């Protein structure tokens, strides 16, 4: 059940059409067992296996060339396309493993099976420019997604419905927030009574059969307890720094990408009442995680790496009673001296010298000509 849940093509659409297609292929295989085949070859286990994996042909083609021999011309079946591999990798993870290593590659070459969603006849593309962030609102969680669809050649020019879906487990109904932006950039939010395990930003063309998505697993909270810190939200700094997530979303960056000639703002929330022994430390560390060309991970993680040398580091001590619980903090970092590459920004709070909570986010410092 978990495998089908993670392989569901779009959480924002009702039902799981991939699983329905799988069952339909099994039924079609039963129907074709004793039927004549268009190409004249007998039905067998090999043909059944191909049908289960790749579907049945929707049309056939034959050669019109003149043939001297008496055997009939070859007939070729054509399955629907474009088709995609929608299962995650790895399909199963160890209980102690890092679930954020799970990823999806719909355009995988030579997949074991394929499915062609009818709503993605023009393509099923990744959304690379996304920034997810989660904030506690009392007993619920607000999840926000800032996005930029301009790198997509279709959605940069054609209208799309953008939806943010959050999922907890296979048995809990998915919650969906919708947005129909006038431009290819925007923000969509959704509120849930639980901490999401999967975040999925999905775009569907309004006048074209094209779909796109960015899906990410969220790291479990340490010891299953509510986090002391929210995710870090990157924003473009202005004259006045934001004091709430609503204000931060008004200038949010649509991707964890920092341009070398610009400063970057960090917004987060602390959910414990600080006292005079509470210390906040921010560090920026070079990292080599991720494959070359892959965008930074789109959602923060509730942990910090081991202490290493950081080119940017700052810390301060909170004043007792200076701010109520849950009020946001904002700082502006100048990363213009850093070379291009991938970095990890961490915000860690300590109480009486002991770590109380941490939040980290991957960012990439872009080259000067990159936009």
Q: Would you name each region that the model predicts?
A:
Residues 1-171:
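Residues within mature, well-folded domains
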Residues 94-371:
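Intrinsically disordered, low-complexity terminal regions enriched in Ser/Thr/Pro/Gly
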């Amino acid at each position: 059940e978990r495998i089908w849940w993670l392989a569901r093509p779009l959480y924002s659409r009702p039902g799981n059409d991939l699983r329905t297609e799988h069952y339909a292929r099994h039924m079609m295989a039963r129907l074709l067992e004793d039927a004549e085949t268009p190409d004249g070859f007998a039905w067998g286990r090999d043909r059944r296996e191909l049908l289960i994996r790749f579907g049945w042909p929707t049309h056939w083609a034959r050669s019109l060339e003149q043939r001297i021999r008496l055997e009939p011309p070859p007939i070729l079946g054509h399955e629907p396309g474009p088709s995609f591999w929608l299962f995650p990798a790895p399909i199963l993870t160890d209980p102690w493993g890092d679930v954020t290593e799970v990823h999806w590659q719909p355009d995988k070459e030579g997949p074991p099976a394929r499915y062609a969603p009818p709503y993605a006849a023009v393509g099923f593309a990744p959304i690379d420019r996304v920034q997810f962030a989660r904030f506690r609102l009392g007993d619920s969680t607000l999840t926000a997604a800032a996005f930029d669809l301009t790198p997509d050649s279709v959605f940069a020019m054609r209208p799309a419905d953008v939806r943010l879906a959050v999922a907890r487990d296979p048995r809990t109904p998915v919650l969906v927030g919708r947005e129909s932006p006038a431009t290819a950039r925007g923000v969509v939010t959704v509120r849930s009574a639980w901490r999401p395990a999967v975040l999925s930003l999905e775009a569907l063309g309004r006048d074209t059969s094209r779909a796109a998505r960015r899906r990410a697993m969220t790291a479990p909270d340490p010891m299953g307890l509510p986090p002391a810190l929210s995710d870090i939200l990157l924003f473009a700094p202005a004259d006045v720094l934001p004091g709430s997530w609503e204000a931060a979303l008004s200038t949010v960056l649509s991707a964890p990408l920092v341009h070398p000639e610009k400063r970057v703002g960090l917004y987060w929330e602390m959910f414990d009442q600080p006292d005079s022994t509470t210390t906040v430390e921010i560090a920026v560390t070079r990292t080599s995680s991720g494959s070359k060309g892959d965008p930074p991970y789109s959602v923060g993680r509730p942990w910090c790496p081991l202490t290493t040398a950081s080119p940017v580091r700052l810390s301060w001590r909170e004043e007792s009673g200076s701010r109520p619980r849950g009020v946001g903090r904002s700082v502006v970092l100048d990363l213009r001296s850093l070379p291009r590459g991938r970095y990890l920004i961490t915000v860690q709070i300590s109480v009486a010298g002991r770590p109380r909570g941490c939040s980290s986010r991957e960012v990439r410092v872009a080259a000067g000509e990159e936009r």
